[in-house]
Amino acid sequence: MLNEQTMHKLYAMKLSGMAESYEEQRQQSQMGELSFEERFAMLVERQWIWKENRALTRRLKYAKLKLDACIEDMDYRHPRGLRRSTIEQLVSCEWIKYHRNCIITGPTGAGKTFIGCALAHQACREGYRALYFYTPKIFRQMAIAHVDGRITNLLKKISRVDVLVIDDWGLATLERHQYRDFLEILDDRHGSGSTLITSQFPTSAWHDIIGDPTVADAILDRLVHNAHKIELKGESMRKKKKRGDEITNAAEDDRKEKKEKKRRPDPSDQGSDNANLGGKA
């Protein structure tokens, strides 16, 4: 009865991790060999892990990352200019702590979005809030927000996150209201948040994308001067993966065909057997 009351109170206080650990301890006889301090430490540790996992789940849900990418899945095998030392430096999230930016450029399919999402995922692990936007989508949302009067709230939401991910920047030349909105976002975030940009185009081409030289200078000043840069090169990772899958499938088909041939009886052997049978008759 006392145990049931204790469990009820733990759940009522939202200490689910501690309650689960307590229930496990009750069912394990060897727990009696541990001291009270050791058992209590186990309860607290489980509650801490439970709380941290819940918080991480909320941060990832809020971030709305395009890809379920993480640092552990980073591929360094292909020669595309991705240095392990650069990623290891960014994994520490010091760049976020000091409100620096990150710019990832390279051809289509080079893995820019994957790397960007992996770094944002790592930021969420470290307790930072991230928010992902595909470039056309963020401008579309801002255009709608201007019409229905939500633009102030939207800009406030964007400015408050620790890491803002803008994916596929520069797909089209910006219109006047777009680059002004974007400058306002960067101005609000300058010195208080980190922005991660992925783009097919090098930063030297961004003046043409923005259009207005004065605004372009202001945007690049806020984005580029304190940014970590990852410049990817080479063939599309998607094409390489597809080609690798095709080779793997072809090899698998070849193995299956050879296996099938071994199982299939040789017609010449059957003819020889029939001849022998005829001779005996």
Language model segments and positions:
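Walker B motif beta-strand of ABC-family P-loop ATPases
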Residues: 163
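Interdomain "pre-motor" coupling segment immediately N-terminal to P-loop NTPase/helicase cores
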Residues: 11, 16-67
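Conserved P-loop
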Residues: 82-160
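Extended interfacial segments that mediate partner engagement and assembly in macromolecular machines
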Residues: 53-105
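Short hinge/gating elements
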Residues: 8, 24-28, 73, 101-102, ...
